[in-house]
Amino acid sequence: MSDQESASLREEKNEIINGMGSGAPSDEEEGEDVFDSSEEEEEDDEDEARKISEGFIVNDEDEDEDEDDENVADKKKKRRHKRRAREEEDDRLSEDDLDLLMENAGVKRPTTEGSSGGKLKRLKRVGDEVESGAADREQESSQEKESSRLNDFFSDDEDEEPYDEENRERSRGSREYDRGESNHQGDNRKSGMLDELDDFIEEDEFSDEDEETRQQRLLERKMMREQRMKAPTKITGLSSDKIDEMYDVFGDGHDYDWALEIENEELEGGDINEQSEEFDEETGMTKSSKKKISLQDIYDLQDLKKNLMTDEDMLIRKTDIPERYQELRSGLVNHGNLSDNDQELEKNWISEKIAVDKNFSADYDLTEFKEAVGNAIKFITKENLEVPFIYAYRRNYISSRERDGFLLTEDDLWEIVHLDIEFQSIINKRDYVKRFYSELGISDPLVDEYFKNQSTGSVAELNSLQDIYNYLEFKYAQEINDNLQKESDKSGKKHLKNSNYEKFKSSALYKVIEAVGVSADQIGNNISSQHQIHIPKDHEALKPLELIELVLNENAGDLQVFLSNIKLAMDTIQKYYSWEISKNTKVREKVRADFYRYYLVDVVLTTKGKREIQRGSLYEDIKYAINRTPLHFRREPEIFLKMLEAESLNLMTLKLHMSSQKQYVDHLFQIALETTNTSDLAIEWNNFRKAAFTQAIEKIFNDIAQEIKDDLEKTCQKLVCKVVRHKFMTKLDQAPYVPDLKDPKLPKILTLTCGQGRFGSDAIIAAYVNRKGEFVRDFKITENPFDRSNPDKFEEVFEDIVQTCQITAIGINGPNPKTQKLFKKLIEVIHKKNLVDSKGTHIPIIYVEDEIAIRYQNSERAAQEFPNKPPYVKYCIALARYMHSPLMEYANLSPEELKSLSIHPFQSFLSPEYLNRAIETAFVDIVNLVGVEVNKATDNSYYASVLRFVSGFGKRKAIDFLESLQRLNEPLLARQQLITHNILHKVIFMNSAGFLYISWSKKRQRYEDLEHDQLDSTRIHPEDYHLATKVAADALEYDPDTIAEKEENGTMSEFIEFLREDPNRRSKLESLNLESYAEELEKNTGQRKLNNLNTIVLELLDGFEELRNDFHIMQSEEVFSSLTGETDKTLFKGCVIPVRVERFWHNDIVCVTNSEVECIVNAQRHLGAQVRRPPNEIYELNKTYPAKVIFIDYPNITAEVSLLEHDVKNEYNPLTYSKDPAIWDLKQELEDSEEEKKVTMAESRAKRTHRVINHPYYFPFNGKQAEDYLRSKERGDFVIRQSSRGDDHLAITWKLDKDLFQHVDIQELEKENPLALGKVLVVEGQRYHDLDQIIVEYLQNKIRLLNELTSNEKFKAGTKKEVVKFIEDYSKVNPKKSVYYFSLNYENPGWFYLIFKLNAESKLYIWNVKLTHTGFFLVNYNYPTVIQLCNGFKTLLKSSNTRNRSGYR
């Protein structure tokens, strides 16, 4: 094995020990063309690929070293050109691919060799040509200048400079031709288009030029640029003075041209390192004269990351693989390069995972299902097709042939995408373990048998592979050390393993294990076969202790430590014997299989959990959970995630065990190690073996329990992720709001909010948004809609707004229930004033979901869009936009805003990774269902936000796509231009083309002869265009000869036009027998296209028909929750809530909750009726009382409540979980309840009568309760409480920092009685007259001094250990400087540490500083300020040093 392979193995080993290793894929791996099977470059081995990916130059010094210098230079030149050619070829279509694309698009591609090259020109109308001539000349100049703009870093030109240079030459010629031949431009456009398409694959006109010629060409090009830069700048409408002033402020846009010029030259000639190589004749080596300049040399790396412009980002942009796949596979090596056997294993492995949730019957034949899964895997891994494409255009390959059979859903496909990554990790680890085993040069029957079984059976799991690896490390530590020793001799580094087991194995004590009578391997065989193949043999004469004594006596010199402690020797032998058993893979495999099959989960409460988990707690439903099975967690995955969360908070521990676990262990012992003899000798040896075996099994149980917890957590995260994803999809899956479904035009919208609802003092804000979603204007309605003195004024203003803007829909929402009052008023005005649309229908008014508007009104995006508008105007704009498109509104939220959405109650249990997955996959599915209009996205950043979710795209590719479109400087006319203009490459085009559409109606008005423009506005994929034309021809019932003629002439698209114009097209299309047509097509071509045919028929009837659900109108319960913030968990019938008395109405009482829900207390629901007194004599205004909810009126946002004592005491708390004794520990619950009652009674007995002090800061707390109360408060907050020292003491508890509180004692003197407040209060020897004086003169001074110190630059936050480490590190970096910092003393609240070092060599000193109400006390002196404290410290230090020096003299 080579040194390089050994080094690689060592690196992989370090990664594998802690899980699957990760490594960045090379450029060739990431950028390999999946359609190109060419392997011309056989000399480029893996080492070269890796070096290239790392940015190094491959020096082929080992090839042809005997050739002369000239041959070496020629070879390098040829190799550079060959690499450039190959890089261009990888991203371009082959001739066959282009022919196929043109054929599917209905364009017949000529084969003549003299066709002109260049990009597809914009088609012009005849009337526009003369006007465009001058514009073209100006455009040429502006485009050349544009090349130096910073945003062109995203340009595709970086990778295709030779191609662009050639295009510039051709473009210049084309423009000159256009100016000179304008009279001939009305000729056959179709022919011209075909000529240009024919030259899509460029020929490298510089392929044969030598280095000197190339340098000359670059020099000429540079001179041309300099001439252009020297030319005077003309800007229409600006004088030269204004232009100069503008340049002074903004620059001329060429500040970074030096870097771009170098980069352009690099791209022109390939790798800049290669370009700058010089051949040294003396050494025979190449030397580099320049350093490659990248974007990181110009911009800050953080800015590049923020704008997705790092080298990794640019690589993802250019690699012709879907961006989401690249991100998922970034940690894998050689993804997709599986053997045929591994591919079959992957299909079976993933099929088993997916089938779990399909509920197939036990006798269901999975053959067809596995075939469908295999097809999906092939599409994902081999063809790099994303889920939306597979589901839309390959559905017949992932479903049953039976009509009511299975179908792999989008959920299944996304799961397969991630399972493929997991499987690749398993295979990588398996291959590593195989190489590791092979390098050891040993043969272990157990390992050999394991890999033999894995090659013929199902794939190994990571856990079993880890077992093999751990087994090898444990058993063959010496061989590993020998191998490492050989490598260290070569590299000079030593990383040898220190194995205690090897030391024990070489000692005399190991003889006792050999005498046990059955080895670990034999135990593994017995357990694996469930039969005692190897029968244990007891020692002939000696018991275990006797044998140990004998061994110790015979080896007293080596084992002296055990002579006086034979028990230690016994324990040591049993420990290592148990290790041998626990590392045996057969034992672990059997125990793991049984444990996974029969395990149960119990909750074991901690003391903290018993105390804190009470009724109403989040963890109430799992407090006494027992015997929970895997099936329970699959049905309710959130339960296990909740358990893990509670465990992390130290509220409980999870105990995983097998049912009848003790009996199981006894059974294994009987078949593996127990002898049937009944003699005392046999009993002793059986006891010895069982003790060791029990230790081994317990160790295995613990390991497997942790494995199960990890696996179960991942499984439950996936299941909850699916639930959250579906819930979020319901939010996205809404069509725009349309008042009249028969006339589906977007409405002109007026949205309103009344803010806090203070009518008459606060204005009502409204915003008008037109049909295009553009904000037009806002309105501020100051008139009070409920003004009784002038009720018509508001109505007139509102009517005028509606009539002026011609509003067709009204939306409303707000932050409180006052909005409902306005809503009812607006309905009244609409009917009273008869405000109707053009069809005479009353203008609808609806509540609009405002979760996005709430986030938008104060967002950075809103500030950029509408910097001068108040928040409520922005709120209304967002409401209107939501009515136009909920999808667009959600898509424009930032990642942080998306995560803050309340999607589902269980989303808090998801890790950020799974939450992001749920959100992104939901976006991808819905966006591709809707489609994206390409030209609209080009100049509308709001609309373009959905591009990143198009199949094959991502954030980076969406940016690249938009910049490529913008460089065209003209609308895209056909999908085929995405290929012919080099905007997309093969794989991304295949993924995205069907979801990117071009509006045909607009295009037809300007461009009449472009082929297949009508199909470009449908969901029909370009690969099916030819099939669509045949469907149209069959529907029109043309004879085969006519169809064949048009097919031969390339005019099949005419059938589409004929069909569109046919008034009976629906009946003709629906009469087609698509099933038989699909069968015939599959028989002839092998393609399964039934679903595609159905799509073609639907799209020919109505291209990109709206497939989303109707806009969701908020129901009364949702409106109630939106305006009040209450949910069915916080406000429900039977619950008890606090209400504030607002007014009295006859014998009723009107109250209000904290959420402003109006509550009515009827006369029979309060004490007034019982004592026959009016309620205002019993209840006080503005006072809060507990009330029980009797009824909730959701439409009117009111409730009926009761203030009666017996109602309040009988609160209804519904039990939402099962207390079935089979899964709930009733016995433990009862015991804990009794214990809690005892503790409560003991505490109540110990408590004295609570003192009541008439002061706003006095609370009936003890010390712990005071700390808990202040924990969420700010620094400096405090409470006054009763002291534990007796009735003549009080205490102040105040907060110094997070989880840091000081308790200050107050002694009371001159008390009138034990419960009265003393007339004199003493704090730290200082006398005060009342509590307020203590607060002002003592406590507030301490708070001020605390804030002064903590805000000083010499204060360091953190623990003592952290501050000490910081000072030590600082001192090492600055060895000659002294350093000191203050930090909080968490062990003694009210004290600070003063930590300092004089220099790097001195010891670390820690002094204590006390915080007083007059300053800081340090070394017998009080310093009033922090500055004086620092100066005093320095003075003390200086005097201390002086004394030390004088003492040495």
From Swiss-Prot:
Source taxon at top rank: Eukaryota
Comp. bias intervals (Basic and acidic residues): 134-149, 165-193
Keyword Transcription: yes
UniProt feature, compositional bias: Acidic residues: 26-47, 59-71, 88-100, 154-164, 195-212
Region (Disordered): 1-214
Organism: Candida glabrata (strain ATCC 2001 / BCRC 20586 / JCM 3761 / NBRC 0622 / NRRL Y-65 / CBS 138) (Yeast)
A Pfam cross-reference name: YqgF
Purpose: Histone H3-H4 chaperone that plays a role in maintenance of chromatin structure during RNA polymerase II transcription elongation thereby repressing transcription initiation from cryptic promoters. Mediates the reassembly of nucleosomes onto the promoters of at least a selected set of genes during repression; the nucleosome reassembly is essential for transcriptional repression. Essential for viability.
Protein family according to the UniProt entry: Belongs to the SPT6 family.
CDD domains on file: SH2_Cterm_SPT6_like, SH2_Nterm_SPT6_like
The organism's taxonomic lineage, starting at the top: Eukaryota, Fungi, Dikarya, Ascomycota, Saccharomycotina
Domain spans labelled SH2: 1256-1353
Location of this chain's protein in the cell: Nucleus; Chromosome
InterPro entries given in the database record: RNaseH-like_sf, RuvA_2-like, SH2, SH2_dom_sf, Spt6-like_S1, Spt6_acidic_N_dom, Spt6_death-like, Spt6_HHH
Protein name: Transcription elongation factor SPT6
GO biological process, one term: regulation of mRNA 3'-end processing
Main subcellular location: nucleus
Basic residues composition-biased segments: 75-84
GO cellular component: euchromatin; transcription elongation factor complex
Keywords: Chromosome, Nucleus, SH2 domain, Transcription
GO molecular function, one term: nucleosome binding
